Amino acid sequence: MANKNSIKTKGAAKTGDQPTINVAIEQNFPKEQRIIEDNLAAQLYSGMNRFWINITKIAILRNWIVNITEKFLPGGWSCFLVRKRYIDERLIESITENKIKTLVNLGAGSDTRLYRLSEAQNISAWEVDQAVNIDAKRKAIEKALGSFPSNVKQVSINFIDEEIEDVLKRHGYLGNEKTFFIWEAVSQYINEAAVQKTFDFFSKAPVGSRLVFTYVLKDFIKGENLYGQEWGYEKFVLKDKIWHFGFDPNQIEAYLNKNGWKLIEDIDYAELGDRYVKPTGRSLGVLDIERMVYAEKI
């Protein structure tokens, strides 16, 4: 696994916008064809990003962008959308059924769920990310909504060098209430030590807390099985050197148990596609190198 000095945190920070840009473009599809609904995503962008979002109102250009994405990274279009849809549903479920009133989003990027989901408006939330992403997002949210929601606290961090617990405590998160943790598209960008450090933090969560996270497959990161994703391996692992860590699906349940969590679901993107893409009638690829986990603190 990568050592501490080889982790390019700036490179990881630059990936925070793309998922939400894809979500914004998705809103230009007819309503019955959309994989996810998000009326805020497009409002976060200006300049060239907004230009590309706007021109995809033209169907031929919209389909061209989707097809180009799928050509280089099969499943690369739908992966952002289905995982966000899944997390949205688990969050709403946790708030309404499990009475969870606290949320921590580690690696929040430009994600909009805290600002668009009605169920999330009255919970106490902390969004944690690199300073450059936090600052840009605050400005974008203030511009889109007129002010920044008082129930959301933004927390800047370096996931490699800093302790999550200490940083959150300084911003008012005490960790004494059941919490919904989101760890979306973070683990591959850090090293094994930082992953374990994150789970050391998760292990202290109150019983009944929920955790949802994505992970890239270990054999892909190691180059043992590329799953038809040669371009992605060349770019993310070899060239840009921003993907460092992967989990083995056969070991994920034991790893969770060791850290005080019970696996609820470890799901691949083929099944997520059946849930969220198939009903739209669209035919999109499947990202076989990533999976989604949902767990409960025990």
Task: Write out the residue ranges for each language-model feature.
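Rossmann-like AdoMet/SAM-dependent catalytic core
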Residues: 2-14, 224-298
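Glycine-rich phosphate-binding loop signature in dinucleotide/nucleotide-binding domains
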Residues: 94-99, 171-177
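S-adenosyl-L-methionine
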Residues: 142-175
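Conserved beta-strand signature within the Rossmann-like core of class I S-adenosyl-L-methionine
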Residues: 204-220
